[in-house]
């Protein structure tokens, strides 16, 4: 049975949060809590989690962390005059393998 790692983002006005889920078959199980940015270093917290899990490959870890970096950068650079739904839609198009929950 294929195991898939899924990044889930919570898009908020003043912060963005990320967590990691695992999909096995039709079931999705949370692996982490939400790590928030900029209140804390969500990227560093996820890196620490990934390094502590020997079953997650280095390649998967690098890909996940790169995606987190790109999404956080996208969130930082967004036009705050544009409705967040448009940003979230653009993000889902750019990263079809992630889940984005937002306002």
Swiss-Prot record:
Any one GO biological process: translation
Superkingdom of origin organism: Eukaryota
Claim: Ribonucleoprotein is one of the keywords in the record: yes
Signal sequence annotation: none
One Gene Ontology cellular component: ribonucleoprotein complex
Keyword Ribonucleoprotein in annotation: yes
Subcellular location per the Swiss-Prot or TrEMBL entry: Plastid, Chloroplast
Pfam families assigned: PSRP-3_Ycf65 (PF04839)
Keywords: Chloroplast, Plastid, Ribonucleoprotein, Ribosomal protein
Gene Ontology terms for molecular function: structural constituent of ribosome
Cited PANTHER family: 30S RIBOSOMAL PROTEIN 3, CHLOROPLASTIC, OS04G0461100 PROTEIN
Function comment: Probably a ribosomal protein or a ribosome-associated protein.
Annotated HAMAP family: Ribosomal_plastid_cS23
Assembly and interaction partners: Part of the 30S ribosomal subunit.
Family of the protein in this entry: Belongs to the chloroplast-specific ribosomal protein cS23 family.
Protein name per the record: Small ribosomal subunit protein cS23
Organism per entry: Euglena granulata
């Amino acid at each position: 049975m294929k195991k898939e790692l899924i990044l889930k983002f919570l898009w908020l006005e003043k912060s963005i949060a990320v967590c990691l889920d695992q999909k096995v078959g039709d079931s999705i199980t949370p692996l982490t809590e939400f790590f928030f940015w900029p209140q804390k270093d969500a990227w560093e917290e996820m890196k620490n989690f990934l390094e502590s899990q020997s079953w997650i490959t280095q390649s998967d870890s690098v890909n996940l962390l790169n995606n987190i970096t790109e999404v956080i950068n996208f969130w930082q650079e967004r036009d705050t005059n544009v409705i967040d739904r448009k940003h979230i839609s653009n993000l889902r198009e750019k990263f079809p393998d992630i889940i984005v929950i937002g306002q």
